[in-house]
């Protein structure tokens, strides 16, 4: 048991290291656009999240948009969609609740969901799981801050101004799910993309690492 714990600590330290973060960064940059062809969007142009969200909504003719985390409406106010719901407990959006509170009471379904709330692995994981429950058929889930540039940008608790949190850990975990197709695009600190369909590029790592 002690050996197992020792190995787990080593793996966690390795996954948090600068080298592995850089490896993830260039892996996503090189390979992940292949599974996104049906969106008819070139993520290699490195557009910002507003351009990406609006372009996808327009090309897929989405009608209902949900945003989790709307700080100062930097994105929410400029998204062009017929029906918009923005959830934030502090500022922005049009629903003043935590994402957990919102999902517990929500009965609506959405075509496009953008997650940019609390940037911790545990909360992002919950936000993804809850979003899947309310995603319309053919819809898409997008996440911000999936590719931190260095160790300090993802350190939790936060230790510097520019902070992506450990959102990337949730992306890695959901890439092991057979029923979800997950990608990360090299744009705007990493835009995660989740489709509710069979995984086309399953990430399989040893069970003892989970």
Locations of regions flagged by a protein language model:
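A short alpha-helical cap/connector motif
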Residues: 1-114, 118-210
């Amino acid at each position: 048991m002690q050996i197992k714990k020792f190995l787990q600590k080593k793996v966690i330290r390795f996954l948090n290291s600068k080298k592995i973060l850089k490896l993830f960064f260039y892996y996503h940059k090189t390979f992940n656009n292949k599974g996104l062809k049906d969106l008819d969007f070139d993520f290699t142009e490195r557009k910002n999240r507003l351009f990406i969200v609006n372009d996808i909504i327009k090309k897929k003719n989405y009608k209902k948009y949900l945003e989790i985390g709307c700080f100062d409406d930097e994105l929410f106010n400029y998204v062009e969609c017929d029906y918009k719901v923005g959830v934030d407990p502090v500022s922005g959006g049009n629903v003043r609740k935590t994402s957990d509170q919102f999902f517990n009471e929500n009965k609506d379904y959405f075509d496009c969901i953008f997650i940019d709330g609390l940037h911790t692995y545990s909360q992002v994981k919950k936000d993804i799981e809850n979003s899947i429950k309310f995603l319309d058929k053919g819809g898409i889930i997008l996440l911000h801050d999936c590719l931190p540039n260095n160790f300090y940008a993802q350190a939790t608790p936060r230790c510097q101004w520019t902070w992506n949190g450990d959102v990337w850990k949730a992306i890695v975990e959901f890439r092991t799910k057979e029923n979800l197709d997950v990608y990360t695009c090299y744009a705007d600190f990493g835009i995660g993309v989740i489709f509710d369909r069979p995984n086309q590029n399953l990430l399989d790592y040893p069970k003892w690492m989970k």
